[in-house]
Amino acid sequence: MFNFKCVFYFIPSTGHCVPPARSGHRCVADSNNLYVFGGYNPDFEEAGGSENEDYPLFRELWRFHFATATWQLVRTEGYMPTELASMSAVLHGNNLLVFGGTGIPFGENNGNDVHVCNVHYKRWNLLNCRGKKPNKIYGQAMVIINGYLYVFGGTTGYLYSTDLHRLDLTTREWTHLKPNNAPSDLPEERYRHELAHDGQRIYILGGGTSWTSYPLDKIHAYNLETNYWEDIVTKPHEKIGYPAARRCHSCVQVKDEVFICGGYNGEVILSDLWKINLQTFQWTKLPAVMPEPAYFHCATVTPAGCMYVHGGVVNMSGNRRTGSLYKVWLVVPSLLEMTWEKLLKTFPYLAQLSTLQLLNLGLTHTLIQRLK
């Protein structure tokens, strides 16, 4: 019997090869794998010592295979970007799109290119774009809606932005969108916020500057049809209220529900998990608590609705980072997912069998693909 609980599970790795502790990285997932790109760790030993040519950054792409719980450093071809902290990343089909980010020192070596890595063919390409590109920034957020990539906010390291740009992924042309609002009605400049969308509006969740974090009781929403920014008043969780203001948190979306987790409010590192429904704008605090509070971590969600959280800064005074990986189901898993988890737990050596053996056991081709 599967007893569903909204709780974080620590995922021990079965191999010797694991990514070092890091922050400022990004991750994406498909049904089979979690991909972790970039990151930063000023601790020389933790960051790989003299073997890491890019210290204190990580110029690398890691893959975590769900079925076997193993990490692998992905050997890629082509030019991998060097802006490795606080870039934005999104998975579009088999393509990992990476935009912006900063090198070291922060703010001195920023990017405004779109790099694409096909995770199937393991090859990086630079997307040759025209039009009005965003400034060289980091800490921005982005979403893909109907073949357009939208980028909002970010910082040069000195100035914070409230700019909204759109890239047509078919024509590869950038457009600097100019909303119809008066300048005083635009969202506050920010970085390390997150974005969600419902197809008609883009919602900004949190973020801030080096001296402030923005609250979540009201949310700025950009209306794609009217070209106006709107203010959305949200509803608090009964007797609990609203989530704390935060920046450097993570955010994933499952249909109409958006989940935020962790972050920093200017005083403490957060460990809570909240969801907001984009139809009712009702906030709900979920029972799951991160095993260690973290910010500058990364999170993503699988198509089946399981969120993975990796890394982050977990101690401010010691500036300590973690390399821990956790997962939490955000929805009740399907019967297939429950059975699959049980099968992998009971027969951990399933992946070592041949395709013919697996077919003889009754596994479908789709499930066999998840093992390879």
What role is predicted for each listed range?
Residues 16, 30-54, 76, 92-110, ...:
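Glycine-centered tight turns/hairpins at beta-strand boundaries that repeat
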Residues 23-27, 83-89, 113, 136-142, ...:
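Beta-propeller and closely related beta-sheet repeat lectin domains
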Residues 1-13, 37-72, 107, 120:
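Beta-propeller domains
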Residues 2-9, 41, 300-372:
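Cullin-RING E3 adaptor/co-adaptor recruitment helices
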